[in-house]
Swiss-Prot record:
Keyword hit for Cytoplasm: yes
Protein name: Ribosome-binding factor A
Alphabetically ordered keywords of this record: Cytoplasm, Ribosome biogenesis
Subunit record text: Monomer. Binds 30S ribosomal subunits, but not 50S ribosomal subunits or 70S ribosomes.
GN (gene name): rbfA
Keyword Cytoplasm recorded: yes
Reported function: One of several proteins that assist in the late maturation steps of the functional core of the 30S ribosomal subunit. Associates with free 30S ribosomal subunits (but not with 30S subunits that are part of 70S ribosomes or polysomes). Required for efficient processing of 16S rRNA. May interact with the 5'-terminal helix region of 16S rRNA.
Amino acid sequence: MSRHQKPTGQSESPRKLRVGELVRHAVAEILAQGGVHDPVLETHLITVPEVRMSPDLKLATVYVMPLGGRDEKLVIAALEQHKRFLRGEVARRVNLKYAPEIRFRIDERFAEAERIEKLLRTPAVQKDLEPDSDQD
């Protein structure tokens, strides 16, 4: 195992979490205020549920989700096109030694939660969840 990798199950450092939250607020504020002049971004409401920082704080992975979950690829492409501008704006709003490189990803937690919920409602799983009436 590398010297810089944490063992599985160990939590994120408080600094990474705090910086990730600051970057998340900055990106969300920029997008909410219409700071990026792009027709795609101006016509979509975009939520930023999470930002994950690399251990050296030089890379920020910004997870985004367009409201309604439509046009995800179009929104990611528009954000990627303006990531230099967004990086500069984040650098102005968040006081860090280095402005983090930004990459955008779709937040798939909602889709995954929906898939699990759907799976739990299947007849086979429902049958397994019912209490046995044979045990008296």
